[in-house]
Amino acid sequence: MQLTAYLHTAITVRDLQRAQAFYEGVLGLQLVHRALNFPGVWYEIGGVQIHLIEQPHVHPERPDPHRWGRNPHLAFAVKDLAQAEQELRAAGYPVQKSTSGRAALFTQDPDGHILELSQV
C-alpha cells in the first residue's frame, strides 16, 4: 500500500448551525459547496477537508481532560497566536496554552472537540 495524500477528517456535531458559526465565523474556514443528502458541511484548508456531520449524540474522546493537547484534536497553523487567542476569548471559547513551551494553544468547538492553533 502506498498512501498518496491526506484527504479529510470527519467529525460529528450536535447542532450544525452552531458549529458553522464557530468554524466559519470564528475560525474563518471557507465552505466547500456540495450537495449532500444528509445534514453536514465541508470545509477546505491547505488542500485538506474537514467534514462536519450532524448527529444527535456527540461524545468527543477525552482521555486526559486536564491537558487538552494529549487528546484527539485537529491542528491548524495561525499567523498570529496572540490575536487568535484574543479572538477566541472574545467569542467566549475556552483557551488552554500548550504546556510544551511552544507557541501553541488549544480550544474547543461548541461540541467539545479540541483544536490546536500553532504559530509556525
What label would you give each PLM region?
Residues 57-63:
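A short, acidic/glycine-rich surface segment
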Residues 12-50:
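Core segments of cupin and vicinal oxygen chelate
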Residues 67-88:
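Mid-chain, well-packed structural core segment of small domains
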Residues 2, 85-120:
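Vicinal oxygen chelate
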Residues 1-18, 71-76:
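N-terminal beta-strand motif that seeds the catalytic metal site of vicinal oxygen chelate
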